[in-house]
């Protein structure tokens, strides 16, 4: 079965064709990141306009790269939640137009569930497992027992980890997006030269995260370090920041693995391309970790089309009333049953 997936949840416009859930025939992405650099973050209005400019191109290229025509597509799939509403509308409108004009079925999927699926594209993973989703908009620990179904165990109470990277990079005038820049600088830095706090919440928040304090500490502590003559170079700041940003992810994931007895863990989301994070989890002796290929860490439509193959018999197909949502329909437990 050939499925054409579309994702326009944030600032990347993507289309992909996947056969039988795992055989990626094509995966095309158009990034609008250059248009957002001067603003040091994603501007929703600009993102939506860039999607309009790119959507037909990425769909057409995905078909050509897969040596496939629209008539060969058995099912269309699109993310309709969560994300920027203006961005989501472009993908949903395009998918609806294609599906209904060709009289083909359409599935609406959860963007988070698609990220959770991304390691499945290159790994054979047994259920249950713990999925850590880390990006500029999300920092979530979930327990996964089946495709498209996940229970949120912990989330961020303020900034997402990727957002913290961007804000620290902005403070240091390093550029946007901050994640790749800080990751690169950290490799040249001394993580022991300066220290930032590792924030670990307890009690009812034992599996939740907080990154606003780390961001503030980087701003004020760095100024203090510079005054007191510490080696607060950009490289050392980046190395110290990475430790404080990544360690809570590992510690809390391990803590939930021990509590639940689940010893399989997956990483997904844009921050999953971070080299220190991949090494920390990938080399773990505490649990078995499955990593997505680097090309499937950021937003992409291959993960959408792949998940759709497994969801086609589990949820209703979408109709003309398909809408978009900025948030996950049910924060605590998502079963993908209500896609409309």
UniProtKB/Swiss-Prot annotation:
Q: InterPro entries recorded for this chain?
A: ATPase_NBD (IPR043129), Gcp-like_dom (IPR000905), KAE1/TsaD (IPR017861), Peptidase_M22_CS (IPR017860), TsaD (IPR022450)
Q: Which domain of life is it from?
A: Bacteria
Transmembrane domains' residue ranges: none
Q: Where in the cell is it found?
A: Cytoplasm
Summarize where substrate binds, as residue positions.
133-137, 166, 179, 183, 274
Identify the cofactor(s).
Fe(2+)
Top-level class of the enzyme under EC nomenclature: transferase
Q: Which family, according to the similarity comment? A: Belongs to the KAE1 / TsaD family.
Q: What does this protein do?
A: Required for the formation of a threonylcarbamoyl group on adenosine at position 37 (t(6)A37) in tRNAs that read codons beginning with adenine. Is involved in the transfer of the threonylcarbamoyl moiety of threonylcarbamoyl-AMP (TC-AMP) to the N6 group of A37, together with TsaE and TsaB. TsaD likely plays a direct catalytic role in this reaction.
Which species is this record about?
Answer: Brachyspira hyodysenteriae (strain ATCC 49526 / WA1)
The gene from which this protein is expressed is: tsaD
For this UniProt record, the keywords arranged alphabetically read as follows:
Acyltransferase, Cytoplasm, Iron, Metal-binding, Transferase, tRNA processing
One GO biological process this protein is involved in is: tRNA threonylcarbamoyladenosine modification
State its Enzyme Commission number(s). Answer: 2.3.1.234
Query: Could you list the residue ranges forming a coiled coil in this record?
Result: none
Q: What is this protein called?
A: tRNA N6-adenosine threonylcarbamoyltransferase
Q: Which molecular function GO terms apply here?
A: iron ion binding; N(6)-L-threonylcarbamoyladenine synthase activity
How the cofactor binds, per note?
A: Binds 1 Fe(2+) ion per subunit.
């Amino acid at each position: 079965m050939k499925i054409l997936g579309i994702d326009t949840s944030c600032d990347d416009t993507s289309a992909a064709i996947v056969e039988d859930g795992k055989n990626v025939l094509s995966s095309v992405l158009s990034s609008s990141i250059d248009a957002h650099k001067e603003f040091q973050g994603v501007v929703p209005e600009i993102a939506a306009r860039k999607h309009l400019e790119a959507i037909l191109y990425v769909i057409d290229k995905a078909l050509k790269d897969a040596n496939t025509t629209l008539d060969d597509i058995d099912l269309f799939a699109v993310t309709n939640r969560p994300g920027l509403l203006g961005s989501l509308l472009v993908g949903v409108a395009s998918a609806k137009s294609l599906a209904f004009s060709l009289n083909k079925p359409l599935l609406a999927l959860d963007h988070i569930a698609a990220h959770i699926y991304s390691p499945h594209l290159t790994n054979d993973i047994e259920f249950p497992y713990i999925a850590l989703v880390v990006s500029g908009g999300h920092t979530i620990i979930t327990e996964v027992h089946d495709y498209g179904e996940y229970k949120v165990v912990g989330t961020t109470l303020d900034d997402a980890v990727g957002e913290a990277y961007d804000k620290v990079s902005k403070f240091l005038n390093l550029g946007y997006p901050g994640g790749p820049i800080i990751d690169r600088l950290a490799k040249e830095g001394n993580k022991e030269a300066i220290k930032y706090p590792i924030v670990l919440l307890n009690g009812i928040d034992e599996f939740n995260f907080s990154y606003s304090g780390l961001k503030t500490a980087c701003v004020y502590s760095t100024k203090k370090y510079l005054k007191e003559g510490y080696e607060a170079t950009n490289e050392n700041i980046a190395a110290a920041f990475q430790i404080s940003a990544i360690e809570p992810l590992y510690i809390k994931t391990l803590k939930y693995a021990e509590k639940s007895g689940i010893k399989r863990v997956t990483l997904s989301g844009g921050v999953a391309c971070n080299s220190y994070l991949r090494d920390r989890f990938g080399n773990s002796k505490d649990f078995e970790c499955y990593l997505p290929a680097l090309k499937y860490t950021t937003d992409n439509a291959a993960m959408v089309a792949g998940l759709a193959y497994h969801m086609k018999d589990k949820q209703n197909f979408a109709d003309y009333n398909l809408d978009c949502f900025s948030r996950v329909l049910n924060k605590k437990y998502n079963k993908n049953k209500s896609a409309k």
